[in-house]
């Protein structure tokens, strides 16, 4: 899968922020297996970019293409199917089900969009230090624990592009490194690309390309 941005910019963003950007109003191509770091200060449209790429919002000008097809040319059913097969995401606001247990949040994703033949939930939870939280309601977990839950959830489905919006903002350095290693391993297994957007560079992300939004 390849993603192209053709002169894309948010309709609400100030012109000076657009003109200084390495993405807005540019011709940008994200290629298969590419590891891309997007460094984006507050107010530059980082979360909007993730939402645009995932097809959640359309308040922008220009075109976003999946494999040469503009996403606004997909009908709703085809777009949903395509996204389930090729895109996974960790949103900045996580979007977990607070009243459900951690395990239930993860099993829903694994069963609805299966990728692994055997459940890796226990293994991934152990690697990220939340194995003792699996049977507790998500809302009782700290925000840092919830970020790790959202990361694991994103890795349980098929994807060729993984979109990450400030995925480590509430993690200490040790847990950031563990999470990044797991993410890179899962992406490599799928020969998938990673687009990681954050406020500042992540030194332990082995990016092929760095773009300043």
Regions found by a protein language model. Give the residues of each.
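ABC ATPase NBD coupling module
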Residues: 71-88
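Helix-to-loop junction immediately C-terminal to a conserved catalytic motif
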Residues: 54
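Conserved ABC ATPase signature
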Residues: 137-145
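Q-loop/switch helix immediately C-terminal to the Walker
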Residues: 93, 99-112
């Amino acid at each position: 899968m390849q993603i192209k941005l053709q002169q894309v910019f948010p309709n609400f963003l100030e012109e000076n922020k657009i003109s200084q950007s390495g993405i807005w109003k540019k011709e940008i191509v994200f290629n298969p297996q590419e590891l891309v770091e997007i460094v984006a200060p507050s107010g530059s449209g980082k979360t909007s970019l993730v939402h645009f790429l995932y097809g959640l919002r359309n308040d922008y000008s220009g075109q976003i293409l999946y494999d040469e097809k503009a996403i606004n040319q997909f009908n709703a059913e085809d777009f949903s199917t395509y996204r389930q097969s090729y895109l996974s995401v960790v949103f900045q606001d996580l979007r977990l089900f607070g009243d459900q247990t951690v395990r239930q949040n993860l099993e829903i994703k694994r069963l609805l969009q299966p990728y692994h033949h055997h459940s890796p939930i226990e293994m991934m939870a152990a690697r990220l230090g939340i194995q003792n939280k699996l049977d507790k309601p998500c809302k009782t977990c700290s925000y840092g624990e919830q970020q790790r839950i959202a990361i694991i959830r994103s890795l349980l489905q098929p994807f060729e592009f993984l979109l990450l919006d400030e995925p480590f903002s509430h993690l200490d350095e040790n847990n950031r490194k563990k999470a990044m290693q797991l993410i890179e391993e899962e992406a490599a297994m799928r020969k998938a690309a990673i687009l990681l957007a954050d406020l500042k560079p992540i030194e332990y992300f082995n990016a092929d390309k760095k773009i300043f939004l």
